[in-house]
Amino acid sequence: AGIYLKGNARLNLTLEGINELVGLDDGAGIEVGKGAKLVITENSTGRLKAVGGAYGAAGIGGKGTASDEGADKNCRTGTIIIKGGSITAEGGAYQIPKTQDYYGGAGIGTGRYGIGGTIKILGGTITAEGGKQTGAGIGGGMSGRVDTIVIGGTKGEAPDITVSSYKHSTRGYMGAAIGSGWNGVSGLILSCGDIRILSGSVKVKG
C-alpha cells in the first residue's frame, strides 16, 4: 500500500501540493484496515490520486485478494472520513487468468471480497471510480460490502462528488456507483449497509 493503517492506527492527513499513491498487488492506495481510521482534514488544499493494487484493492480503503477471504478479519475495512482536498480514487482490478475479465475493488471502500467499514465524505472535491467491471465507485468491491456510507451532513457540509462504477463495453455497469460491488447480494438482500446523502453535490453513473 502507498500508506497502510492497521490495528488501532489513526491518521489525520492534510493534503498539500500534488500527490499520488499507488498500491501494489493486494495493497490499496491508502489502506485502512479493520479498527484503523483515516481522516483527510478540512485544511487540505492539495490533490491526491489513490489507485488500488492489481489484486482488486480499493483506491482508498480495503486490501484486495486473489481468493475468497471476505470473512477473514484481514480483509475488513476501517473508517474513512474525508473533509477536504481534491481526491481521485480508482479501484484496482484482478485479471482472471486466461480471460479478458476482471474483478475490481471500490474506488473508496472495500477491496475484492472485502467486508465492513464506514465511509463519511463531508467535504472536498471527490472523483471515485470502481475497479474494472465489478467495483462500486464508493462502497464494495467485487463480492464486497461496507457497513455505512454518509455523504454531507446537517452543519453546512458541501462535498462535490462525481462517482461511477466501471462501464464494461458489452455488459454495461456491473457494480453500483454508490453501494455494493457486483455479486454483493445475499439472499436477494443488498448487502451494503446504510447509505445517507444529506447535502452537497453528487453526480453518479452506475
What are these regions (language model features)?
Residues 1-206:
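A composition-driven surface/loop motif
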